[in-house]
Swiss-Prot record:
Antibody KHRI-3, which is directed against a N-linked carbohydrate of CTL2, causes hearing loss when infused in the organ of Corti. This is Choline transporter-like protein 2. It comes from the Eukaryota. Coiled coil: none annotated. Interacts with COCH. Glycans are attached at N186, N199, N414. It holds the Pfam family Choline_transpo. It catalyses: choline(out) + n H(+)(in) = choline(in) + n H(+)(out); ethanolamine(out) + n H(+)(in) = ethanolamine(in) + n H(+)(out). GO terms for molecular function: antiporter activity; choline transmembrane transporter activity; ethanolamine transmembrane transporter activity. InterPro entries: Choline_transptr-like. Expressed at high levels in lung, colon and in supporting cells of the inner ear (at protein level). Progressively lower levels in brain, tongue, liver and kidney (at protein level). In the tongue, strongly expressed in epithelial cells and in nerves within the musculature. Within the nerves, expression observed in the perineurial cells of the nerve sheath, in the Schwann cells and myelinated nerve fibers (at protein level).
Length: 705
């Protein structure tokens, strides 16, 4: 009755099918609608990229441009002798829009040199100093009969000049510290040109935002220099990581059992030592003044070291560690058989990888496709961000019929609008644009990010289905490897693309939706950081936590659904349901296997990354005497070391992702094998002899007539 209730809640066990011999070859296309939707989305994505490439100019990220979009210092232009960019009001560069649009929302002009003195327009007006001041006004500026107020309203001159220095062709305030006080030039405050004085810190904030991307550029140049002299040794380090990853996978085949049990024993010993240490501290504090005060009486203390002088603290630690120790020992006693099954599956996965060795190279295909996705997303994002244009508006008195309309400063004075409104002016308003394309820029950026998530998840899903199909053909071969197809990996790849593109698109679409929601929540969280609404912060934290958990669950469900797709060729929803029910019918085995394999793979990654990282550290810091003179001189020795560490992790992760997919595939096949077959001559088990021995299962020999 208990089994019936369990199977009723989570479906019924797989029934015996005499025609089933592994991955089904006669299958049809699944989730065709999602396949069409993916195709249309890709067409739209390409169109967005083409439009962005037409309007955008990535040179705006690197080279300075004035408010009219003209590059400073470019040969053959009127700004050829004006290499530096000057901001009218650099304080406005502290706006968050700078990061999104790569532009400060203030008029900008190209100048021959940066200002070297404090000077306001009001003080310079009608004095000889105005000749110096005029070079920082808009090109071809003439006083005529305008007053200071009108010039400032028209945005033709800055209100104030501040001592500045050029940095990456931009003029930034000459900020320095004197006896701990931030100064620009020789002052700590400045006149804003409107009769009031402001603190230097406002300039600092503006300069920080505008200067951030420039400092990153200089850093990038030094890093590039380091790569040019150390790339050879970085490649050698990555090759060592690849060799170590292969050796670890080979060792798992023979030493998986020993490694698992050694780790379990070490965990028990560490917890045991923790209990002993807590008891010794508890006994040592006996009789000491103040050690018997309870935690509740002491209350909350910001210095947590105070609690270590209380006996109650060590007693609590000892109780917690003792409970953990007892739980682990009880789990080992009652789950020892399932741990042995997990070890046997890991060994079996090593054999499967050995028979399908080309599977270890498949992560290179995934890596290449992901690089294409990242490159297209990044380039499109940059082109979209640099699509904004300087927008000018007509500003005049209330009687002007053209008030607020868009204008062009080059032609405004000869236009009908200027004749209709003699007192009007064409003034810089903002960076953006008023076309439908410019109004849709934010939406296009979100679509760009969403498509990146969708395509990246699709590439990962394609790899998982391909590997699952190859390893499933190994498990369901009764005589291994004789009954396996000639090229299992290529056959699985072809089936995945030919029949299941729609299913892969469906699964990756669900995951992409959750991921883009998480990105939007992160953006909103950043916007709410300055707010004091505690309820909003609490709600945002809960939402972020929920969607993080949802993403993890969907990834787990998708992974197992792709295995079922690779084996049976069913659509995504059917495969996800069948995989979920199969796992829930064997939930304890799933939990044990998942944790054992995760722990083993984590150990392997740490071992490989740690070994190669330590070797790289000693080499690039000239601490290995044998090759001390061989190591190249560097600006930042952490650049090649960090590259080797990250690269080693990616290589190890690539190898272990193949191994992990193999274990998961064999595990699902193993569970189905137990439900489908009974070991008779008509329904023999497909599992290895080691697994059959652990489960006390045997295949009965056919009765000879």
């Amino acid at each position: 009755m208990e089994d019936q209730r369990k199977y009723g809640a989570y479906g019924t066990p797989q029934k015996y099918d005499p025609t089933f011999k592994g991955p089904i070859y006669n299958r049809g296309c699944t989730d065709v609608l999602c396949c069409v939707l993916l195709f249309l989305a890709i067409v739209g994505y390409v169109a967005v990229g083409l439009i962005a490439w037409t309007h955008g100019d990535p040179r705006k990220v690197i080279y300075p441009t004035d408010s009219r979009g003209e590059f400073c210092g470019q040969k053959g232009t009127k700004n050829a002798n004006k290499p530096f960019l000057f901001y009218f009001n650099i304080v406005k560069c502290a706006s968050p829009l700078v990061l999104l649009e790569f532009q400060c929302p203030t008029p900008q002009i190209c100048v021959e040199k940066c200002p070297n003195r404090y000077l306001t327009l009001l003080n310079a007006w009608n004095t000889p100093e105005f000749e110096y001041y005029k070079q920082f006004c808009v090109p071809d500026f003439q006083k005529n009969k305008k007053g200071v107020a009108q010039v400032l309203r028209d945005g033709q001159c800055p209100a104030v000049l501040i001592p500045s220095k050029p940095l990456a062709q931009r003029c930034f305030p000459d900020i320095h510290a004197h006896k701990g006080v931030i100064m620009v030039g020789n002052a700590t405050t400045y006149e804003d040109g409107h009769g009031s004085r402001k603190n230097i810190t406002e300039l600092v904030e503006g300069a920080k935002q505008a200067n951030g991307i420039l400092e990153a550029r200089q850093l990038a140049m030094r890093i590039f220099e380091d790569y040019t002299v150390s790339w050879y040794w970085i490649v050698i380090g990555l090759v060592i990581a690849m060799v170590l990853s292969l050796l670890f996978i080979i060792l798992l085949r023979f030493l998986a059992g020993i490694m698992v049990w050694v780790m379990i024993v070490l965990v028990i010993l560490v917890l045991g030592y923790g209990i002993f240490h807590c008891y010794m501290e508890y006994a040592r504090l006996r009789g000491e003044a103040g050690s018997d005060i309870s935690v509740l009486d002491l209350g909350f203390q910001t210095d947590f070291r105070v609690y270590l002088h209380l006996r109650q603290t060590w007693l609590a630690f000892m109780i917690i560690l003792s409970i953990l120790e007892v739980i682990i020992i009880l789990l080992l006693i009652f789950l020892r058989k399932r741990i042995l099954i997990a070890i046997a599956l890991i060994k079996e996965a090593s054999r499967a990888v050995g028979y399908v060795m080309c599977s270890l190279l498949y992560p290179l295909v995934t890596f290449f496709l992901l690089c294409l996705c990242i490159a297209y997303w990044a380039s499109t994002a940059v082109f979209l961000s640099t699509s904004n244009e300087a927008v000018y508006k007509i500003l005049g008195d209330s009687s002007c019929p053209h008030q607020g309309q868009t204008c062009h400063p080059e032609t405004f004075f000869n236009s009908t609008e200027a004749h209709a409104c003699p007192n009007a002016r064409c003034q810089f308003a903002f960076y953006g644009g008023e076309s439908g394309y410019h109004r849709a820029l934010l939406g296009l950026q979100i679509f760009n990010a969403f498509m990146f998530f969708w395509l990246a998840n699709f590439v990962l899903a394609l790899g998982q289905v391909t590997l699952a199909g190859a390893f499933a053909s190994y498990y369901w071969a009764l005589r291994k490897p004789d009954d396996m197809p000639a090229f299992p990996l290529f056959a699985a790849f072809g089936r995945a693309l030919r029949y299941h593109t729609g299913s892969l698109a469906f699964g990756s679409l669900i995951l992409a939706i959750v991921q883009i929601i998480r990105v939007i929540l992160e953006y909103l969280d950043q916007r709410l950081k300055a707010a004091e609404n505690k309820f909003a912060k609490f709600l945002m934290t809960c939402l972020k936590c929920c969607f993080w958990c949802l993403e993890k669950f969907i990834k787990f469900l998708n992974r197992n659904a792709y295995i079922m797709i690779a084996i049976y060729g069913t659509n995504f929803c059917t495969s996800a349901r069948n995989a979920f029910f199969l796992l829930m019918r064997n939930i304890i085995r799933v939990a044990v296997l998942d944790k054992v394999t995760d722990f083993l793979f984590l150990l392997g990654k740490l071992l490989i990354v740690g070994s190669v990282g330590i070797l790289a550290f000693f080499f690039f810091t000239h601490r290995i005497r044998i090759v001390q003179d061989t190591a190249p001189p560097l600006n930042y020795y952490w650049v090649p070391i960090l590259t080797v560490i990250v690269g080693s992790y990616l290589i190890a992760h690539g190898f272990f992702s193949v191994y992990g997919m193999c274990v998961d595939t064999l595990f699902l096949c193993f569970l189905e094998d137990l439900e489908r077959n009974n070991g008779s001559s008509e329904r023999p088990y497909f599992m290895s002899s080691t697994l059959k021995k652990l489960l006390n299962k045997t295949n009965k020999k056919p009765v000879e007539s």
